Amino acid sequence: MNTPVVLITGALTGIGRATAIAFAREGARIVVSGRRDEVGQKLVAELREVGVEAEYWRADVRHEDDVRDLVDKTVTRFGRLDIAVNNAATEGRGGLVTEQTAESYAATFETNVLGVLLSMKHELRVMLPQGSGSIVNVSSAYGSVGAAGASVYVGSKHAVEGMTKSAALEVAGTGVRVNVVAPGATDTGMLTRFTNTDENKAALVSTVPIKRLATPEEIAHVIVFVASANAS
């Protein structure tokens, strides 16, 4: 992989963090984004120790001005944008459909769906004139199945997969690719919050055929491959 410029949202923990480290080990130039400045700066220091150029910029993907500025800063700093990993997400409020509110719906969809849409919009604004680029949206295994008690989160991930498929068709033949990675149960802070108790977490693990959770590093390796020319 030739020193691509990689932008990762939701990069400070879990899959996003592991993906940043995996790209750094490939020699990429990296921009990581999130909403916790101290954590972001520590991650950048770790990436630079690997020997790559890296920057952290704060952005809230729910706000278009933040997303626009994040992409513009990336291009100003590095001159281009080759790969974008849209990983920012929230598990939202669990519970039955009858327990949800307009507010709980909006809180999840603004990050998980609108955030991905705005990110793709501004990433493509740069990539299409370049005639090259690769976008990877991070969904979930719940993007293609149902799950009782998680209707809003599940719905948001179905939306991410639908948007990804549509965007991929829109840019076909331009030199830009849009793909989705849909991890199964992965050992992250989000999963711990989602399952809520050790008993629930153990019950989830029992449904996995290999009887263990995936690691963020395993998912990161998939993202790096899907983003690369080897998957084109």
Locate each region found by the language model.
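Conserved mid-core segment of classical short-chain dehydrogenase/reductases
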Residues: 68, 91-106, 129, 149-152, ...
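Alpha-helical segment proximal to the catalytic Tyr-Lys
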Residues: 125, 169-173, 232
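Active-site helix of classical SDR
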Residues: 120, 156, 164
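C-terminal substrate-recognition "lid" of short-chain dehydrogenase/reductases
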Residues: 212-232
